[in-house]
Amino acid sequence: MSTNDSTELLFTAVYESDEDAVVGLLRSGADPESVDEDGQTALYLAAVSDQPDIVRLLLAAGAAPDRLSSGSDAPLCGAACGGHTEVVRALLAAGAGPDTVEGFGFTALAWALRCGHVAVTEALLAGGADPDRPGPTGEPPLVAAARRGSPGCVRALLAHGARARSESLAEARRWLVLDVEAELRASLEQAYGADRDFVTHRYPQDGGDIVEVQLLDPKGNPVAGNDQQTGHAEIAGLLEAALAGS
């Protein structure tokens, strides 16, 4: 079997979540660090596809946990962005750097906080992620969690001694008086133009709600979206208590 053939078969097996095929291909000499024609690594594909068992197989066969896919995408960051907690734990257990920086300055913790993934945030902090390492725009993680509106992420950061508590309290209070739906819609209009159709959804999450605003095309299909949690009142209480006890 040629290298090209084994690479193609390995990626097909990962796409199809076929663990037995992955095992067979690796035993037959397929490179666990194979990349496709776009430069994507097999490990990154498995990580963002939430396939922890295949991630473990590739790591055990020698895939480097921190190797960037397509030159800029870290497997740990991809898993964190998707909320794939078990994959995050597998990568950390294999030696992935908890503060590895990928393209545009993102770390896995920055992605987890931006998306409000509490379990991933807890796993990263338990794995050694710096609770005070600034995100890509230079803001402290606690401020990012307060803006997101995720009480669970704020609790996790406070439990690990995160600083910038006064700034985070100010951010939580700022969002308390804002119309979350209107803010999300405005950000989409700024990016895609005004006079567009939108639809809003609300879902329970993290003891509160998550507000999702989607931009629709002329046929009514969603083409872009943004979301935000609404736990800012609870977050303000958590931060007030933390400041009072410090």
What are these regions (language model features)?
Residues A21, D53-I54, E86-V87, A119-V120, ...:
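Conserved ankyrin/ankyrin-like repeat signature
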